[in-house]
Each structure stands twice: as structure tokens, then as C-alpha cells.
Amino acid sequence: MALVKICGLREPAHALAAAEAGADFIGLVFAESRRRVSVDQALAIARALGEPLAAAGGGVEHIEALLQRKRPLVVGVFADADAETVNRTAEAAGLELVQLSGDEPWDLCGQLSLPILKAVKVRDGTSVEEIIAALRPGAVPLLDTDVEGALGGTGRPFDWVVAAGVARRFPIVLAGGLTPENVGEAVRRVRPWGVDVSSGVETNGVKDVEKICAFVAAVREASR
């Protein structure tokens, strides 16, 4: 069954609604963004979801083991921050995973203390082979649309045929233009390990609880 990450949350109430809907991860953005949160905001959201786990680094199996203990897990989204900043923020904010959404080198993953999702930007014309050649151990790849000047949350999809080709070889998180209306088809066609949404569950730039619930329900239905 595909896992669900609801990203860009800024309010404890929305995080609790995502948890009630059945989300597996909630994402808190520390990179420059209109969805950015402070450490204090993040800690309030994390504590609303329960006592944060002490989660050491690890891959898919480790993340799945953590989900047996607590759900949703709290993911901090960073872009081009150094390892010290990421680790310090993660500890202060009660994070359980980190997501690297900038142009970080893969070897940064070995310096981080938590499990990692690593954004891989997909341009028009990017092939399956190009993506696979760029992957390295140490993080779960999160495939997202490459939009100049944006770090995600753009609402723009990329070619799901390419995503499916990668997903046949590696567990991936699929992002980019997903909505309650199209995520079921995306899950059936790509068969990702997880899916990630931000703008697709917003109304006028604010998280919409009805859309969050509809998104999670669509993923569960398509994963049967």
C-alpha cells in the first residue's frame, strides 16, 4: 500500500486532521517558502502528534519499522542547508525524518542523523536511465517536477511513465502535481512506495481538510 505524505503544514490542527485521515508522514518546511515554519511552530506540531521518536538513520525498512511505532512521522524539509544545521534543527523541532529538496550532494546523507528522503528533480525529457544513474545509497528518492526557482509544491506533474520505470527498480516517493482527483491513477500506474502532496490539498493557499481526507482515501482505494 502506498504511503502518504502531506507536506507544507503550518498548523497543529491541520496536522491532527492529516493524522486522523490516515497520513503516514507530515512535512514541515524549513526551506525558503510561503509554507515555511519556525522551529517553535514545528515543535508544537510535532508534539501535537505525540512524543517524537528517537529515530536513527536508515532506509525503507527502518522507516517502515518506525511507522509501526508511530504514525504519522514528522518530516523536516530542507534545501541546501549544511549537515550541522539540519541535525540541530531536527533535534530541536522533534523531527523523525528529513527531506533534502535542494541541490545537496548525495554524500551529505551520510552526515545526517535521521532517515532521509532525497528529492530528485525530473525535467521534460529526463529518461529512466538518467535518474537511476544519479541515485546513490543513503536515502529514499523523492521524484518531483523540476521547476526553475522552485523547491516543490508547484502543482506541476511530470511523466508518470518515467516514474514507473524507476519505481520498478527502486522504492520511490512520487511528487509533483498530485491531487485527490489524479492520485489514484498515479498510484495504479506508477506503484510508488509513497506519494507526496502539498498544493494539491490546498484551497487559496491554505490546507483544506476535506481535500486531505479525499487524497488519503484515493490512495488507499488505489492501493487495494
Describe these PLM feature segments:
Residues 1-224:
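Conserved N-terminal beta1-alpha1 strand-loop-helix module at the mouth
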